[in-house]
Every structure is written in structure tokens, then in C-alpha cells.
Design a protein with these regions (language model features):
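Long, well-ordered core segments of solenoidal/helical folds
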Residues: 1, 25-48, 73-97, 122-144, ...
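Compositionally biased non-globular segments, especially hydrophobic aliphatic-rich helices
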Residues: 205, 302-304, 323, 330
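C-terminal low-complexity, Ser/Thr- and acidic/Pro-rich disordered "stalk" regions positioned immediately N-terminal
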Residues: 274-311
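Intrinsic disorder/low-complexity segments
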Residues: 281, 300, 321, 328-329
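Juxtamembrane/start-of-transmembrane alpha-helix segments at the extracytoplasmic/lumenal side
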Residues: 307-322
Length: 341
């Protein structure tokens, strides 16, 4: 399943390796993925009638590997397959968020990553997607997959989706950041259930950096001189891959993928290349044009998460090399698995 185009783990690995500029040939993966998509359309009429995130993930794969998700294969009737349209603004007969808030979140991320303009006669507009996310925010600032208590991962993902529109939703974003800060442990980590989770930590790193803040720039996300970057390193195994939980004995592919995306986000914030899914032509702006000031744009906002001028003055020397090494290890492990079945 790890090396099967169209599977969740395989697709996220492909996205991340490509974003890390690992020198692999991705044409075969794209070709196999297109066959998978065409088969699903021929047999089922699409990728999924409830899980819109299937479209979003595969759209990001295609973008990452240099393809066009608006013209990715052919339907049985001979018309082109438009993954962006079918997975976002013209999603099926059921509600885009039927699977949960992540349906709205990743629809907006995929749509903005592609840079596609939404037609006037579309079922959903960009603003519809933004409103669905904003209206789902809990009174404490958090977001949840469904109605209920806040979830760190979903809150962080919502912030990533809203980052291009930060200036319009200062109150909501500041409130979400404050909630995440309160959820952070004394070790600069976040809990998923009863255990510290590297994936949750990675998602928060991506959220903060998408808003053009370094991981050590906000007092609310620093503990006794530790940052989320130093905390993430505690999940790293001796072989360079990352674990889901610190007590795990073996690394986890998705934990490693999300850790790499977090490192990419740190680098993007530092060098101005932007959010991890800021592809050429995307809606996600350059970091220099996307400076979010918590509590600074609207009167009456909650107490802002303040800036610490001293915790992020040093450069992340060797970060790019670190990512390449980790990504290369992933490639080696995958090739060994494929070779030995």
C-alpha cells in the first residue's frame, strides 16, 4: 500500500518527496495515478461521493509532480477529468463537508493551491468554503472534525486554509492561535488522546509558519527556551525517520511525511518561498506579503499571542540538507520494501 498510487500513504509520500526536490522520476507515478483515477471514474463515476478529500489529496499529488489536476485523464464519455472542479466547487450531489470539516478545509487548500478561479455558476464559491470553516469555529477558538470539543490537528489545518485570508479574519485566527497555545504542553508538544503526537505538532508548525511566523517568534508557542522545532526532533529515530509517538519503537511513514512538511514550512517561512502547498500560480501569497499580526487588524480582538523578539534571531542552518537526507532515507526504505515485497 505504501508504493501504490492512489493510496493515502503513497500519495502523501510522493507529494512530500517532490516538494523536497528529491531527484526521482515521477512520471511513472503520475501515469499510474492517472490510470487509477480513470478506472475509478469509469467504475464509480468519480473518486468518492462522500470523502471529498480523496480529490484534494490527489490534486495536490498532481500539482506536486508537475501535472494539471484540471485535466488529468479522460472520462468514459471522452471529456477531461477535472479533479479541482469535481472535488471542490462542483463536488457531487452531497455536501462538500459531509465527511467532516476537513472536507471544507482541504477543498479550500486544494483550490487555492491550484490557483483556479471558481466559475460564477459553480455549486460552491470560495467564500462559501471560507464561511463554512469560519462558522464551524467553537467559542473557545478551536475547530473540530464534527461539532464538539476542539481538535488540535483540525484547528491547525483550518488556520492553514485561512492563511491567505488572514487580514479579513483576524479575530478568528487570533482566537484559534490562543487556543492552540493553551493546548501546548510544557514540552512544546501537543497531545492526541493521552499521548504526545508528532503529527499534531507538525500541523501546528505548518499553521504558524503559513501565517509567516517563525516557530520561535510567538511567546505562546515557546516553553523554557524550547520551540516546536526542538520538540519535533525528539520524535526522530536513529535512522532519521520520525515516530508517531515518542514511546513508539519504530518510525511511521505518515509521521515522517508530516514532519518533512513541517520542516519545509519552516524553510519556506525563513526564505520567503511560502507555505508548503504554495505552488507556482497558487493563491497562497509570498511570505513577504502575508504577515499576520495577531490581534492587530480589528478592534476588540482577544489578547494577542505576542512576539518574542529574541527566540528566532538565529538561522536554521542546514535545514535544507536535513530535509534532503530524511527524504533520501524514505526513498531507500521504500525501494527496499518494493524489492523484497
Amino acid at each position: 500500500d505504501v508504493v501504490t498510487p492512489g493510496s493515502s500513504v503513497s500519495d502523501w509520500i510522493a507529494i512530500t518527496l517532490a516538494r523536497c526536490n528529491v531527484p526521482e522520476s515521477y512520471s511513472q507515478y503520475l501515469e499510474a495515478l492517472q490510470k487509477y483515477v480513470e478506472t475509478r471514474y469509469a467504475e464509480d463515476g468519480g473518486l468518492h461521493d462522500v470523502k471529498a478529500t480523496e480529490y484534494h489529496r490527489i490534486s495536490l499529488v498532481v500539482l506536486s509532480l508537475g501535472g494539471d489536476p484540471t485535466n488529468f485523464g479522460t472520462k468514459p464519455d471522452g471529456t477531461p477529468i477535472d479533479l479541482i472542479a469535481d472535488g471542490t466547487y462542483n463536488f457531487g450531489e452531497k455536501e462538500l463537508g459531509l465527511q467532516g470539516l476537513n472536507g471544507w478545509i482541504w477543498a479550500l487548500i486544494a483550490l487555492d493551491a491550484s490557483g483556479v478561479e471558481v466559475p460564477e455558476d459553480a455549486r460552491y464559491s470560495r467564500q462559501d468554503m471560507i464561511d463554512a470553516i469560519i462558522n464551524a469555529q467553537n467559542s473557545d477558538g478551536s475547530f473540530a472534525l464534527d461539532k464538539g470539543n476542539g481538535d488540535v490537528d483540525i484547528t491547525a489545518m483550518a488556520l492553514q486554509a485561512l492563511s491567505p485570508y488572514a487580514g479579513r479574519y483576524d479575530r478568528e485566527i487570533t482566537s484559534a492561535l490562543n487556543w492552540l497555545s493553551l493546548e501546548m504542553s510544557d514540552n512544546c508538544t501537543f497531545f492526541y488522546g493521552t499521548s504526545e503526537s508528532s503529527e499534531s505538532l507538525s500541523q501546528v508548525i505548518m499553521a504558524v509558519t503559513a501565517l509567516n511566523w517563525g516557530v520561535g517568534d510567538m511567546v505562546g508557542f515557546v516553553r523554557d527556551g524550547q520551540t516546536m522545532y526542538t520538540a519535533l526532533n525528539r520524535f526522530r529515530c536513529e535512522n532519521g525517520l520520525y515516530k508517531h509517538q515518542q514511546e513508539d519503537e519504530k518510525p511511521d511513514y505518515l509521521a515522517t511525511v508530516q514532519a518533512l512538511q513541517a520542516l519545509l514550512s519552516i524553510r519556506g517561512q525563513q526564505n520567503g518561498s511560502g507555505y508548503v502547498f504554495a505552488y507556482q500560480g497558487s493563491i497562497f501569497p509570498p511570505q513577504s506579503d502575508n504577515v499576520f499580526v495577531p490581534g492587530g487588524n480589528q478592534a476588540g480582538t482577544e489578547e494577542p499571542v505576542s512576539e518574542n523578539q529574541n527566540t528566532n534571531t538565529w538561522l536554521w542552518i542546514g535545514l535544507a540538507a536535513e530535509m534532503v537526507v530524511i527524504a533520501a532515507i524514505v526513498v531507500v526504505v521504500l525501494k527496499r520494501r518494493k524489492k523484497h515485497g
